C-alpha cells in the first residue's frame, strides 16, 4: 500500500507540472465545452486548435492578464478583414460575424474603430470563440505567443 501511495503521489505531481484544469464560468459559452484540460507545456500553435491565453488590451471589459480559451482562426502571415457588414474573414474565408458587445453603440464609431484589414505579423494569432457573443480578437486584436499559456482540450 505504501508503494502504491508513493506512485500515486508521484504521478499526481508529474500531472500537475504539465496539466491543469480550466473552467469557463461564463453563462453564455463562447466555446463548445465548459471544462478544459490545459497542457501548459504545449505552446506550439496550430490553426483551429484551442488555447488558453492571457488577454491584453481588453479593458474595461476584462483586466489585462485574465485568462481565456479561444480557438486559433488566424496565424502569422494570414490576412484578416472585417468589412462594413461586420463579416470577419481570414484569407477570404468567413470565420465569424458581428460585434454583439457593441450593439446600441454609435454605428459610425463602430465602423471607424472595428472594421479594416491587416496582415498578421510574425508573432500574431487571431483568436475567436465559436459564438458571435464571444469577446475575442474582434475586440482586442491579435494575441502574441508570450500570452499563450497552453493548449486546451475540451473535456465537457
Where are these regions (language model features)?
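Short, surface-exposed secondary-structure boundary micro-motifs
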Residues: 41, 56, 85, 93, ...
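A short, sequence-level motif marking secondary-structure junctions
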Residues: 43, 73, 96-106
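Mid-length scaffold segments of soluble, non-membrane domains
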Residues: 63-97
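Acidic/glycine-rich C-terminal interaction modules and beta/coil loop segments
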Residues: 24, 98, 104-152
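Protein maturation boundaries and topogenic segments
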Residues: 1-67, 117-119, 138-156
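Residue-level recognition of short, solvent-exposed, well-ordered loop/turn junctions
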Residues: 46, 75, 83, 120-122, ...
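Solvent-exposed loop/turn segments at secondary-structure junctions
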Residues: 43, 58-59, 80, 88, ...
Amino acid at each position: 500500500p505504501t508503494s502504491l501511495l508513493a506512485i500515486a503521489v508521484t504521478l499526481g505531481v508529474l500531472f500537475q507540472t504539465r496539466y491543469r484544469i480550466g473552467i469557463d464560468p461564463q453563462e453564455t459559452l463562447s466555446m463548445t465545452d465548459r471544462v478544459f484540460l490545459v497542457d501548459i507545456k504545449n505552446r506550439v500553435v496550430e490553426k483551429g486548435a484551442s488555447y488558453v491565453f492571457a488577454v491584453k488590451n481588453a479593458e474595461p471589459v476584462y483586466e489585462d492578464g485574465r485568462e481565456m480559451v479561444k480557438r486559433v482562426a488566424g496565424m502569422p502571415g494570414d490576412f484578416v478583414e472585417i468589412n462594413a457588414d461586420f463579416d470577419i474573414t481570414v484569407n477570404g474565408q468567413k470565420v465569424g460575424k458581428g460585434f454583439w458587445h457593441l450593439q446600441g453603440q454609435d454605428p459610425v464609431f463602430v465602423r471607424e474603430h472595428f472594421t479594416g484589414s491587416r496582415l498578421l505579423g510574425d508573432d500574431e494569432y487571431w483568436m475567436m470563440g465559436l459564438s458571435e457573443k464571444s469577446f475575442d480578437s474582434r475586440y482586442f486584436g491579435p494575441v502574441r505567443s508570450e500570452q499563450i499559456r497552453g493548449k486546451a482540450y475540451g473535456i465537457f
